[in-house]
Amino acid sequence: MLTVLQRVKEARVDIDGQTVGKINHGLLILCGFEPNDSLENIKRMLDKCINYRIFEDPSGKMNLSLKDVNGGLLLVPQFTLMADTQKGLRPSFSNAASPELGRELFDNLLTLAQKCHQNTQSGCFGANMQVYLCNDGPVTFLLQF
């Protein structure tokens, strides 16, 4: 599993002109899944992201987590993160989980996130989404599980 974790001032996901997920101050997480990903991977990733100290404390040091700042969490599935770009001029997606497995893993992630973090929003697996964000910092991390 590969995730892009972005600290945002605000973010939203639109599908066909309708907003399906929106947060203010918080985290936008783009998620790509591999065939060998499991529920355990998802739990580890979610725990790390929610508790990762990337928000500034009063002295300006990155010392606070999403839970500490009571921020929003916006989860967006993005299978293109799993692209192999080493050869040629066209990406290969052979490293990505199948659409069926990817949907199952994303649904599990969303369910777990909603149970442990009240302000959780999401995009829609398999949809053509427009993602709007105001990156705060910018602060962006690439996490692999």
From Swiss-Prot:
Catalysis: reaction(s): glycyl-tRNA(Ala) + H2O = tRNA(Ala) + glycine + H(+); a D-aminoacyl-tRNA + H2O = a tRNA + a D-alpha-amino acid + H(+)
Keyword tRNA-binding: yes
BP terms from Gene Ontology: D-amino acid catabolic process
Enzyme superclass (EC): hydrolase
Transmembrane stretches, start-end: none
Motif (Gly-cisPro motif, important for rejection of L-amino acids): 137-138
Alphabetical keyword list: Cytoplasm, Hydrolase, RNA-binding, tRNA-binding
UniProt subcellular location: Cytoplasm
Keyword Hydrolase applies: yes
InterPro entries: Daa-tRNA_deacyls_DTD, DTD-like_sf
A GO molecular-function annotation: Gly-tRNA(Ala) deacylase activity
Family named by the database record: Belongs to the DTD family.
Domain notes: A Gly-cisPro motif from one monomer fits into the active site of the other monomer to allow specific chiral rejection of L-amino acids.
NCBIfam families membership: D-aminoacyl-tRNA deacylase (TIGR00256)
Function: An aminoacyl-tRNA editing enzyme that deacylates mischarged D-aminoacyl-tRNAs. Also deacylates mischarged glycyl-tRNA(Ala), protecting cells against glycine mischarging by AlaRS. Acts via tRNA-based rather than protein-based catalysis; rejects L-amino acids rather than detecting D-amino acids in the active site. By recycling D-aminoacyl-tRNA to D-amino acids and free tRNA molecules, this enzyme counteracts the toxicity associated with the formation of D-aminoacyl-tRNA entities in vivo and helps enforce protein L-homochirality.
Subunit relationships: Homodimer.
Protein name: D-aminoacyl-tRNA deacylase
Species the sequence originates in: Legionella pneumophila (strain Lens)
Organism classification: Bacteria, Pseudomonadati, Pseudomonadota, Gammaproteobacteria, Legionellales
Gene responsible for this protein: dtd
